[in-house]
Design a protein with these regions (language model features):
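TPR-repeat structural position
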Residues: 31, 65-67, 101, 152
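Canonical positions in the second alpha-helix
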Residues: 40-41, 76-77, 111, 162
Length: 189
């Protein structure tokens, strides 16, 4: 798998195999194996922005914490496909982790202000459930960014909005308890 594919893109068959391997490694929390696999695929399929997006998202996981490298891959994914909302979210997270808080908040806000149906059914959409999760996670992260920027009232508003829109059985990268802990910290500020 060392040679670059002429088109730089995966075939549908390769894409399915890739997705299956990716999901398997994720379910095992095998981040080292996942990073190794993604880097191999990135060399072979340099035009597949999703590979770079997944690399970035994996590299800023707490147990991996390779933030500068995550930023590099998120930036590359954005250059290839700047309109994919998951790319925008991953890029905003990477910006946050390298300390570019203003820019990070700008990108989270871009997702928050976007119409849910545009996210759900646009070119890169995966349905309303996915769109809700992406928007809610962006609201949560906007709260975190504002808290770090000492914009406490805005942070409170974001966390309250997150809690108000979180539905039972709705997937999120964050829990209600995490949002409540942030609000508890903010009550004294």
């Amino acid at each position: 798998m060392n040679t670059v594919n002429k088109s730089g893109y995966m075939s549908a068959k390769t894409g399915k195999r890739f997705q299956s391997k990716l999901e398997s490694l994720k379910s095992e929390s095998n981040w080292t194996g996942m990073i190794r696999m993604l880097k191999r695929y990135a060399m072979r399929y340099p035009n597949e922005y999703y590979i770079y997006q997944q690399l970035a998202a994996t590299l800023y996981i707490d147990s991996v914490s390779q933030f500068k490298l995550a930023y590099k891959y998120a930036e590359r994914a954005m250059k290839i496909e700047p309109d994919d909302d998951l790319n925008i979210y991953t890029y905003a997270c990477a910006l946050y982790h390298v300390g570019q808080l203003d820019k990070s908040l700008e990108y989270f806000t871009k997702i928050i202000n976007k119409d849910i149906h545009e996210i759900a059914y646009g070119e890169h959409g995966e349905g309303v459930r996915y769109a809700r999760q992406l928007i809610n996670d962006s609201v949560y992260m906007a709260g975190v960014v504002c808290q770090d920027m000492h914009r406490y009232n805005e942070a409170k508003d974001y966390f309250m909005r997150y809690l108000g829109s979180k539905k039972p059985f709705q997937y999120s990268d964050f829990t209600k308890k995490q949002a409540m802990n942030h609000l508890l910290e903010l009550t004294n500020k």
